[in-house]
Curated annotation (Swiss-Prot):
The gene is Polr2a. The modification N6,N6-dimethyllysine is found at residues 1838, 1859, 1866, 1873, 1887, 1908, 1922, 1936. Zn(2+) 1 binds at residues 71, 74, 81, 84. The keyword Zinc applies. The modification Asymmetric dimethylarginine is found at residue 1810. RNA binds at residues 67, 460, 499. This is DNA-directed RNA polymerase II subunit RPB1. Component of the RNA polymerase II (Pol II) core complex consisting of 12 subunits: a ten-subunit catalytic core composed of POLR2A/RPB1, POLR2B/RPB2, POLR2C/RPB3, POLR2I/RPB9, POLR2J/RPB11, POLR2E/RPABC1, POLR2F/RPABC2, POLR2H/RPABC3, POLR2K/RPABC4 and POLR2L/RPABC5 and a mobile stalk composed of two subunits POLR2D/RPB4 and POLR2G/RPB7, protruding from the core and functioning primarily in transcription initiation. Part of Pol II(G) complex, in which Pol II core associates with an additional subunit POLR2M; unlike conventional Pol II, Pol II(G) functions as a transcriptional repressor. Two Mg(2+) ions are coordinated by both the catalytic residues and the nucleic acid substrate to enhance substrate recognition and catalytic efficiency.
Length: 1970
């Protein structure tokens, strides 16, 4: 939140955060105290004589009125004064309409006369209520209210039974005694409300008195409330301090400040006052009138009228939408906007202005595609970039760059808009300011224009999921639209038909950092919603990729070269062509293999892959090239299409993301697009009308098919007319007919479509788009070529509209295909007018559906989000909401994040017992097999050792148990589960990395496998803790993964299938552990919002209405959005309630028995089995009028068992339908019994035999005997009889249940088609088998009764009515049911949502023990704070409630904090940072008085480029400041060669006075220091010297492009020809620096500490940069003491985590490897030789470990061919000792782990006074060097800088000759020969090249040309980029696999002799000349 203060917008003092918000009602005296208008506002006018009037409605004390004016209260101006409240004293109190209902509730709870609670507060019930409702005052009131409702008398003394006020006279004594309740004992009135008035009415108090009803005036209520005691207030749920009952009645009305009701000034007319002001004027007027009338003693009814009016005005000011009241209007007739309307609704204050605001620094324009951008870039128009600014703080490092921007001003781009001084003054650069204003100082802020590389947030509405707002890097481009990469359109759901998108430029570095680390596009590639990528390759690239990877694509050399030009990660090697003769040709697959990153392994299929191939004999051949195999990063076979490159789980992109990390995947996307699109330019892809034409035979076919279809339809119609059509079960005749017709027509369409497709050639362009998956489907093709097909509206054929026909052009009752919407033309042929009309009808329906659906799903999504917004993973790993209620104990029940899991198969679940044993049991009896798989010694061990055999048996037992467990968990045998760590792929990776030969026996001991897996599963911890509960929870969370682990890594499969070596197995275990730990959900993750988005987003894709799917046995279930709505609303009456009834035993298999149960369930009334009924007058039963009944009726009457005389002459004859009777298994007897049971003796019912021709029931009324007596009324009676009989008839037909359950109207019986409803059993062999059993499905539900039926399976039977399940089975059952129903809704249309999101929603809805609907009735009844509730719905009601009860909001949720502008406790806001004050002492001061800080000052040079990848390390981070001279600033820590983390900045010459005149800079300056291409901690991979990079490191550095083609920036001091201390080629030559003579041991080019491969090695310094003794202290791990090299601190920089040698988050070989740390990224020093966790000799990461694979991006010197212990590299060869006999890398003083190098070694202690790197102790190559050697003290004569042999000025050893002078013109770095005046020293002459034998500064033994160490030797040439740690694909061990030849002349930017100015001389040239 920003306060006032200086105009910078930030207030000077930091604002405290708001901890909680207390609600309450203001008391009248408080209102008066806070009011600024003493005496109240008395006048309705606003002004008087043109001045605002004191005491009027525009009182100047209330705030500023004119723009220029000041406030009379606080003297602030318009922006500063917040406004002040006034007040109006009301003449009579009035009700507050918001509290009216509360007022009534309280009134009903207290005595009308004595204001005591009607229930004694000692009543146990009250005590119970108080205990139960702690902290829920609202509940308390409700309960107390329920208790008091029944009481209609105020309880007197202790005699509770004292009903009538007999003891009233002694009431006074009662009060003094205080024994009982002490009430007055009088009758209580009922309180009623009418409009805004309350009435009290008494019902006859005593027998004689009448009811009396009086109007309750607000005064009276006020009096009653005033007498309520504080304790009783509390019982009533009020908080006496904040909200007493009498304050709910308005006596003093607050007048809002002027800023809340500003007047609008219209030109030329008076001010237009705000609605509120108008309202207040009305109130003041009527109030004054009322006061006058009262004082003048007016008539009562006048005053009553006035009070009523005042009441009305006060009410409508608060709420102008009161029911039953007229609206308060303005003169124009527009209703006024009341306070309530200001708050509520989407546009209201809360949702419109607090929860969501309009923001600055945003831009919006149309988007257009640009495939050449990277996926995380966004092209921004220059016009926008020049308008949006970013405030950058001036530091010594960026002052020159900013000064330059300021100089350019706002008119030129890039420039700046404002300078903000440190005192807050803002200088606007748009209006030419004084030049003196433009001077910058550190601490100022410059608002500079947006420039390349800035981080922005890009967003497209509707923002349905988190992938709709992602971070991009800016790329400024001409023209006026945002450009973005095509692959990013999928997550944004964007297309380029005119979509607009928004861009937000974050304004602080913190925000930037968060976006960069959390929200950048590459990090969002995989969505947690369904654990798959959301970005794939689309459109033309996808079409092209399919064409490109076909078998017959060959490229010539020229084309290959051309394509490689577009491959940014190319390592400079062209692969061997696939075809050599007659001319070299490369295949598309080969080129694609270059694009695939790393060592990816992947198997997919092409979209046209035939299903039967996988099992057939050709499964390895794949005749159609449809099986895609990528092995070790090479595309071996297969055509790529959407399946491998699209957004599916397990696609190439997905694997790349999981294995290689997001950054490499980003390059993968870009490279595919640039390379493939450029190939497509050569190849071409077009589509024309020709593609839509098939051959004539096909058209003939199509015609015939359609003709036949029409014929079939006519036949069906005729059948229906002739009544020959049998209705299918459960359908009417009409439905059956429609279904059949539909089927015929659809078959016709499909058939024609497929024949049309078959006719298309392989080269058809429609087809190629469909096959690749880029656009369209088979149906689209067939519609274009063959037939458009049937048009539907609401799932049926086009309905009749005009008098039994669809259009007037058809005859009536035409059911034929044409008339009902079958379009038989194709799009190519064109539609006839009627067809076109029907087609338009179908299309229009789709549009309407979409529009309606959008609104529905939008609201659903909002409710979901609001209900779960504050649910997050806390630091104890539980999932809780804002009020700390546990929702889940572990997120997703396994504690893992959704992005990092994949589908895997559980191997043990499916196979039969035999297969299981064969695959998993280690068979130690079969010796031959063992010998094949294990090495000899292991075989002996296994065969001879019983202990081992027992272990192996135990392992198998364990797996068998696992299998049993799995079969319980997955009873259906579905083995696909979502787990972290794809084990099979990891094993495959291991096989590739360790070059496992599957034909050789393995050296992996089976026991090692068993033990290893056991150990590993102990390490995979989700739940910490040792108590039984934690242990159980841990087991539950990791059970599936452990089972998967044990079954995949079992000894048998390890030996037989995988054949891993011991080494590989160790690697695998380490990898699994680190991958598993990376997959754990992060605390602070807002999983609630994530789940809501993940469910809401698929909902928008769902269909809205459910169509009746034709042919499904007519049983309809609601699906799609309506069903989702029912579920989350927990609707009591779902549209289609239904039970799925499973049966037991015999009845499940026997249709007859199933039918019995069906009859027992289905509700049958008499009507359902009745054919017809009739009423006859049949006075003589013996000879009935119905002749056909005569026979059997006589039988009855011959021997009547009833009184024939009582029988009524009226007869009800019911004829039953035999078919229905038998269908429902009913007999006549049963029916008659039911009737007799229902009506008893009042009816006589006789029936004929079940086998009779017609089934007849005859029913007569039995008259009672006395009716006979009253003869004279007989006629009436007889009339009665037949009417009565009518009633009985209708009652019997509808209401009488013959059998079944009332609620179940219909039951369907069928055999399940899908597996999930079949009964799955496990056979004896242990296989799964699905049996078809009869299942019943019902319309209507009655779970309780159905479950108790005989033969119903009570376990599997389910209901889809959630509420019913809750009532019958309880909360756990309903949770599972809800989850299943939700899953069913979502998966119905083929979407997949990860289980954790569904689970979270279900848990949110059920975790309170009752069902919480996701509506205002559920969400807003939780105990969350009022602010959260009011941001959802019912805004005003919630706030009123909160005020009345004095609630407080603890500010723990998300909404609350957003409303108050605070950081929400989510994500990075849910923890605090701890600052180590001790470490801050090591911080570095930056002297600001740096000489030469001009435009060409050193820092200007550095930051002249785009912000470097790191953005510059802030000086305070690094502790290198001992002994800094004023020039020290020049060596700012972040200035060094291209941003190496600890770059040359801390160079000795910084501390030495030698560099006194330093603008001159060190060669360590990479000419493009900040360029993205320079090696920096955040861009580990880019600086591969290869690729399209010029020797000067990176042509992509924006700053250098325009200014200096060769990479020299002319004004950069480093290249200033006269700069004395700089000579780009001088090895380390600074004539004045005594310590740096070229022979200084720390300099020899071969000195280990000077590894040319260290990233900071700048291309122009041929051998050594004077500023960095160990060549960039962070050079990832080479430089013997690297990590410990900091003069002041053992670990790099205590404050910068990324430099600490032990930093856990870095590893050079990253993705695939991490010895001890969960996540690595390559250039970290933690790989340094001294880092304890990784010593090159550490056994399991031995230098030969292939894991340092050729492409491992950052190859550090621990790589095999350079690891000191690596046998193949043999640095131990005597002639390698780099310049000193006792300094062989294996010598104790060097070995990286050697104690003498440890930073803590005594002579190296950081506290040693001036332990600068150039102090002699640090010269590793000096012969007598031994760090602990006492003789080596810095003052030792041997090393005195003035010692003749060392001093650069001494004639003996001036590198060139004594006459060399720093200013000598010949010493210009740009002079072509560049010789510092002496031939022997010209770096371009062979004699002095580091490879020349004569140059061996201190040690004759080490000639750089010595064979083992020739720098040009391909294995290790210090100059060869191939060996540079940053080169992405280089492995010294495999020169053959590597693709970069070290001798390639043009490419070795790091070569010492490679002087930029003489490109012709390359390291090997000079070598040859020697």
């Amino acid at each position: 939140m920003h306060g006032g203060g200086p105009p910078s917008g930030d207030s000077a003092c930091p604002l405290r955060t708001i901890k909680r918000v207390q609600f309450g009602v203001l008391s009248p005296d408080e209102l008066k105290r806070m009011s600024v208008t003493e005496g109240g506002i008395k006048y309705p006018e606003t002004t008087e004589g043109g001045r605002p009037k004191l005491g009027g409605l525009m009182d100047p004390r209330q705030g500023v009125i004119e723009r220029t004016g000041r406030c009379q209260t606080c003297a602030g101006n318009m922006t500063e004064c917040p406004g002040h409240f006034g007040h109006i004293e009301l003449a009579k109190p009035v009700f507050h309409v918001g509290f009216l209902v509360k007022t009534m509730k309280v009134l009903r709870c207290v005595c009308f006369f004595c204001s005591k609670l009607l229930v004694d507060s000692n009543n146990p019930k009250i005590k119970d209520i108080l205990a139960k409702s702690k902290g829920q005052p609202k509940k308390r009131l409700t309960h107390v209210y329920d208790l008091c409702k029944g009481k209609n008398i105020c309880e007197g003394g202790e005699e509770m039974d004292n009903k009538f006020g007999v003891e009233q006279p002694e009431g006074d004594e009662d009060l003094t005694k205080e024994k009982g309740h002490g009430g007055c004992g009088r009758y209580q009135p009922r309180i009623r409300r009418s409009g805004l008035e309350l009435y009290a009415e008494w019902k006859h108090v005593n027998e004689d008195s009448q009811e009396k009803k009086i109007l309750l005036s607000p005064e009276r209520v006020h009096e009653i409330f005033k007498r309520i005691s504080d304790e009783e207030c509390f019982v009533l749920g009020m908080e006496p301090r904040y909200a007493r009952p009498e304050w709910m009645i308005v006596t003093v009305l607050p007048v809002p400040p002027l800023s809340v009701r500003p007047a609008v000034v219209m030109q030329g007319s008076a001010r237009n006052q705000d609605d509120l002001t108008h309202k207040l004027a009305d109130i003041v007027k009527i109030n004054n009138q009322l006061r006058r009338n009262e004082q003048n003693g007016a008539a009562a009814h006048v005053i009553a009228e006035d009070v009523k009016l005042l009441q009305f005005h006060v009410a409508t000011m608060v709420d102008n939408e009161l029911p039953g009241l007229p609206r308060a209007m303005q003169k124009s007739g527009r209703p006024l906007k009341s306070l309530k309307q200001r708050l509520k609704g989407k546009e209201g204050r809360v949702r419109g202005n607090l929860m969501g605001k309009r923001v600055d620094f945003s831009a919006r324009t149309v988007i257009t595609p640009d495939p050449n951008l990277s996926i995380d870039q966004v092209g921004v128009p220059r016009s926008i970039a020049a308008n949006m600014t970013f405030a950058e703080i001036v530091t010594p490092f960026n002052i020159d760059r900013l000064q330059e921007l300021v100089r350019r001003g706002n008119s030129q781009y890039p420039g700046a808009k404002y300078i903000i001084r440190d005192n807050g003054d803002r200088i606007d650069l748009r209006f030419h300011p004084k030049p003196s204003d433009l001077h910058l100082q550190t601490g100022y802020k410059v608002e500079r224009h947006m420039c390349d590389g800035d981080i922005v947030i890009f967003n497209r509405q509707p923002t349905l999921h988190k992938m709709s707002m992602m971070g991009h890097r800016v790329r400024i481009l001409p023209w006026s639209t945002f450009r973005l990469n095509l692959s990013v359109t999928t997550p944004y759901n964007a297309d380029f038909d005119g979509d607009e998108m928004n861009l937000h430029l974050p304004q602080s570095l913190e925000t930037r950092a968060e976006i960069q680390e959390l929200a950048m596009v590459p990090r969002m590639i995989v969505t947690p919603q369904s654990n798959r990528p959301v970005m794939g390759i689309v459109q033309d690239t996808l079409t092209a990729v399919r064409k490109f990877t076909k078998r017959d694509v060959f490229l010539e050399r020229g084309e290959v070269m051309n394509l490689l030009m577009f491959l940014s990660t190319w390592d400079g090697k062209v692969p061997q062509p696939a075809i050599l003769k007659p001319r070299p040709l490369w295949t598309g697959k080969q080129i694609f293999s270059l694009i695939i990153p790393g060592h990816i392994n992947c198997i997919r299929t092409h979209s046209t892959h035939p299903d039967d191939e996988d099992s057939g004999p050709y499964k390895h051949i794949s005749p159609g090239d449809t099986k895609v195999v990528v092995e070790n990063g090479e595309l071996i076979m297969g055509i790529l299409c959407k399946k491998s490159l699209g957004t599916s789980a397990g696609s190439l992109v997905h694997i790349s993301y999981l294995e290689m990390g997001h950054d490499i995947t980003r390059l993968f996307y870009s490279n595919i697009q640039t390379v493939i699109n450029n190939w497509l330019l050569i190849e071409g892809h077009t589509i024309g009308i020709g593609d839509s034409i098939a051959d004539s035979k096909t058209y003939q076919d199509i015609q015939n098919t359609i003709k036949k279809a029409k014929q079939d339809v006519i036949e069906v119609i005729e059948k229906a007319h002739n009544n020959e059509l049998e209705p299918t079960p459960g359908n009417t005749l009409r439905q059956t007919f429609e279904n059949q017709v539909n089927r015929i027509l659809n078959d016709a369409r499909d058939k024609t479509g497929s024949s049309a497709q078959k006719s298309l050639s392989e080269y058809n362009n429609f087809k190629s788009m469909v096959v690749s998956g880029a656009k369209g489907s088979k149906i689209n093709i067939s519609q274009v070529i063959a037939v458009v097909g049937q048009q539907n509206v609401e799932g049926k054929r086009i309905p009749f509209g005009f008098k039994h026909r669809t259009l007037p052009h058809f005859i009536k009752d035409d059911y034929g295909p044409e008339s009902r919407g079958f379009v038989e033309n194709s799009y190519l042929a064109g539609l006839t007018p009627t067809e076109f009309f029907f087609h338009a009808m179908g299309g229009r329906e789709g549009l309407i559906d979409t529009a309606v659906k959008t609104a529905e799903t939008g609201y659903i999504q909002r409710r979901l989000i609001k209900s779960m917004e504050s649910v997050m993973v806390k630091y104890d790993a539980t999932v809780r909401n804002s009020i700390n209620q546990v929702v889940q104990l572990r997120y997703g029940e396994d504690g893992l994040a959704g992005e990092s899991v994949e589908f895997q198969n559980l191997a043990t679940l499916k196979p039969s017992n035999k297969a299981f044993e064969k695959k998993f049991r280690f068979d130690y009896t079969n010796e031959r097999a063992l010998r094949r798989t294990l090495q000899e010694d292991l075989v002996k061990d296994v065969l001879s050792n019983a202990h081992i055999q027992n272990e192996l048996e135990r392992e198998f037992e364990r797996m068998r148990e696992d299998r049993e467990v799995l079969r319980v968990i997955f009873p259906t045998g579905d083995s696909k589960v979502v787990l972290p760590c794809n084990l099979l792929r990891m094993i495959w990776n291991a096989q590739k990395i360790f070059h496992i030969n599957p034909r050789l026996p393995s050296d992996l001991h089976p026991i090692k496998v068993v033990e290893g897996v056991k150990e590993l599963s102990k390490k995979l911890v989700i739940v910490n803790g040792d108590d039984p509960l934690s242990r159980q929870a841990q087991e539950n969370a990791t059970l599936l993964f452990n089972i998967h682990l044990r079954s995949t890594l079992c000894s048998r499969r390890m030996a037989e299938e995988f054949r891993l070596s011991g080494e590989a197995f160790d690697w695998l275990l380490g990898e699994i552990e680190s991958k598993f730990n990376q997959a754990i959900a992060h605390p602070g993750e807002m999983v609630g919002a994530l789940a809501a988005q993940s469910l809401g987003e698929p909902a928008t894709q769902m269909t809205l209405n459910t169509f009746h799917y034709a042919g499904v046995s007519a049983k309809n279930v609601t699906l799609g959005v309506p069903r989702l709505k029912e579920l989350i609303n927990i609707s009591k009456k779902p549209k289609t309630p239904s039970l799925t009834v499973f049966l037991l035993g015999q009845s499940a298999r026997d249709a007859e028995r199933a039918k019995d149960i069906l009859c027992r369930l289905e509700h049958t009334t008499l009507r359902k089995v009745t054919a017809n009924t009739a009423i006859y007058y049949d006075p003589n039963p013996q000879s009935t009028v119905v002749a056909e009944d005569q026979e059997w009726v006589n039988v009855y009457y011959e021997m009547p068992d009833f009184d024939v005389a009582r029988i009524s002459p009226w007869l009800l004859r019911v004829e039953l339908d035999r078919k229905h009777m038998t269908d429902r298994k009913l007999t006549m007897e049963q029916i008659a019994e039911k009737i007799n049971a229902g009506f008893g003796d009042d009816l006589n019912c006789i029936f004929n035999d079940d086998n009779a021709e017609k089934l007849v029931l005859r029913i007569r009324i039995m008259n009672s005997d006395e009716n006979k007596m009253q003869e004279e009324e007989e006629v009436v009676d007889k009339m009665d009889d037949d009417v009565f009989l009518r009633c009985i008839e209708s009652n019997m037909l509808t209401d009488m249940t013959l059998q079944g359950i009332e609620q179940i109207s219909k039951v369907y019986m069928h055999l399940p088609q899908t597996d999930n409803k079949k009964k799955i059993i496990i056979t004896e062999d242990g296989e799964f088998k699905a049996l078809q059993e009869w299942i019943l499905e019902t319309d209507g539900v009655s779970l309780m009764r159905v479950l108790s039926e005989k033969d119903v399976d009570p376990v599997r039977t389910t209901s889809n009515d959630i509420v019913e399940i809750f009532t019958v089975l309880g909360i756990e059952a309903v949770r599972k049911a809800l989850e299943r129903e939700l899953y069913h809704v979502i998966s119905f249309d083929g979407s997949y949502v990860n289980y954790r999101h569904l689970a979270l929603l279900c848990d949110t809805m059920t975790c309170r023990g009752h069902l919480m609907a996701i509506t205002r009735h559920g969400v807003n009844r939780q105990d969350t704070g009022p602010l959260m509730k009011c941001s959802f719905e019912e805004t005003v009601d919630v706030l009123m409630e909160a005020a009345a009860h004095g609630e407080s909001d603890p500010m723990k949720g998300v909404s609350e904090n957003i409303m108050l502008g605070q950081l929400a406790p989510a994500g990075t806001g849910c923890f605090d940072l701890l600052l180590d004050a001790e470490k801050c002492k090591y911080g570095m001061e930056i002297p600001t008085n740096i000489p030469g800080l001009g435009a060409a000052g050193p820092t200007g040079m550095f930051f002249g480029s785009a912000p470097s990848p790191m953005g510059g390390i802030s000086p305070a981070m690094t502790p290198w400041n001992q002994g800094a001279t004023p020039a020290y600033g020049a060596w700012s820590p972040s200035v060094g060669s291209g941003m190496t983390p600890g770059a040359a900045g801390f160079s000795p010459s910084a501390a030495s006075d030698a560099s006194g005149f330093s603008p001159g800079y060190s060669p360590a300056w990479s000419p493009t220091p900040g360029s993205p291409g320079s090696p920096g901690p955040s861009s580990p991979y880019i600086p591969s010297p290869g690729g399209a990079m010029s020797p000067s490191y990176s042509p992509t550095s924006p700053a250098y492009e325009p200014r200096s083609p060769g990479g020299y920036t002319p004004q950069s001091p480093s290249y200033s020809p006269t700069s004395p201390s700089y000579s780009p080629t001088s090895p380390s030559y600074s004539p004045t620096s005594p310590n740096y003579s070229p022979t200084s041991p720390s300099y020899s080019p071969t000195s280990p500490s000077y590894s040319p491969t260290s990233p900071s090695y700048s291309p122009t310094s041929p051998s050594y940069s004077p500023t960095s003794p160990s060549y960039s202290p962070t050079s990832p791990s080479y430089s013997p003491t690297s990590p410990s090299y900091s003069p002041t601190s053992p670990s790099y920089s205590p404050t910068s985590p990324s430099y600490s040698p032990t930093s856990p988050s870095y590893s050079p070989t990253s993705p695939s490897y991490s010895p001890t740390s969960p996540s690595y990224s390559p250039t970290s020093p933690s790989y340094s030789p001294t880092s304890p966790s990784y010593s090159p000799t550490s056994p399991s990461y031995s230098p030969t470990s292939p894991n340092y694979s050729p492409t491992s991006p950052n190859y550090t010197p621990t790589s095999p061919s350079y690891s000191p212990t690596s046998p193949s590299y043999s640095p131990t060869s005597p002639n390698y000792t780099p310049t000193s006999p006792n300094y062989s890398p294996t010598s104790p003083s060097y070995s990286p782990t050697s104690p003498s190098y440890s930073p803590t070694s005594p002579s190296y202690s950081p506290s040693s006074p001036r332990y600068t790197p150039q102090s002699p102790t640090y010269t590793p190559s000096s012969p007598s060097y031994s760090p602990s050697s006492p003789s080596y003290s810095p003052t030792s004569p041997k090393y005195t800088p003035t010692s003749p042999s060392y001093s650069p000025s001494s004639p003996e050893y001036t590198p060139a000759s004594p006459k060399y002078s720093p200013t000598s013109p010949k010493y210009s770095p740009t002079s072509p020969k560049y010789s510092p005046t002496s031939p022997t020293y010209s770096p371009t002459t062979p004699k002095y090249s580091p490879t020349s034998p004569t140059y061996s500064p201190t040690s004759p033994v080490y000639t750089p040309t010595s064979p083992k160490y020739s720098p040009t030797s391909p294995t290790y040439s210090p100059t060869s980029p191939k060996y540079s740690p940053t080169s992405p694909t280089y492995s010294p061990t495999s020169p053959k696999g590597s693709t970069y030849s070290p001798t390639s002349p043009g490419y070795s930017p790091t070569s010492p002799t490679y002087s930029l100015t003489s490109p012709a001389i390359s390291p090997d040239d000079s070598d040859e000349e020697n």
